[in-house]
Amino acid sequence: MKNLKWRRVKKVTMVEFFIAFRHIIERKFQSIFSVLGVAIAVTVFIVSLTVSNGLEKNMINSLLTMSPHILVKNKKSKFFDNYEGTVENVKKIKGIKAVIPQMNSQSILKGNGLAKGVLADGISPENVKNGLNLKIVDGNNNISELNSVLVGEQLATEMNLKVGNEISLVSAENKEIKLIVRGIFKTGFLDYDSNLAIVPLEAMQILSDQGRVATEIGIKVEHPEKVEGILSQVRNVI
């Protein structure tokens, strides 16, 4: 007992206890807020990434509604004269989903006292039904009658067009044909929805006065990731 040394313990006052308690509590809340801050930041990042991916996917789907995976044009001429033979050869390639000969031209659409420059795209009725994944918001996608036309939703709004309306399509050569609006479509891509009019391929051939020709051939494949391999086969048959 003689070797033991005693130290006097200082009495803790209420003020000192309060200061210590406050620092402990503050640090605890600082830690909580730090964790919450990180959690919120990560959540915002994940949500933003998800939205971004969703928007990107929607954009790609909108573009591919009208845009093919492979687009074939004639280097030597503005037109394909014997496009039917080319189409049949391409259809034989494994992995091809649709082959769509098209006849398109910048034209003027007139209706309800209004006129607007549009891209008139001539596509066969069969390819409109089976080759295009058009979302029809009014009417239908049947353009089997020669005087049929489908217009984009924004274009219909701008020109106050309704299903059943009669309109005129005027070519760059100032040739005019009368058409009836059969349907209104929406792709989700503004350039298409506000500037595109789809008419029967034969009607565009008549309007252009070039006979049975096409300006391009669009090709859609079953597996887009394999498009490079299919492209090399397409080159061999055209």
Model segments located where?
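N-terminal Sec/SRP start-transfer signal
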Residues: 2-43, 56, 61
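Hydrophobic, regular-secondary-structure patches
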Residues: 43-119, 144-145
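Short aromatic/hydrophobic contact patches that present stacked aromatics
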Residues: 69-71, 148-150, 216-218
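The feature marks short, hydrophobic/small-residue-biased sequence motifs that occur predominantly
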Residues: 102-143, 175, 198-201
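Short, solvent-exposed hinge/capping segments at secondary-structure junctions
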Residues: 132, 151-165, 207
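A residue-level structural signature of the nucleotidyltransferase/glycosyltransferase Rossmann-like core
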Residues: 147-148, 196
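Short conserved beta-strand and strand-loop elements enriched in small hydrophobics
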Residues: 161-177
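Mechanotransmission and gating elements of multispan inner-membrane complexes involved in transport
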Residues: 172-238
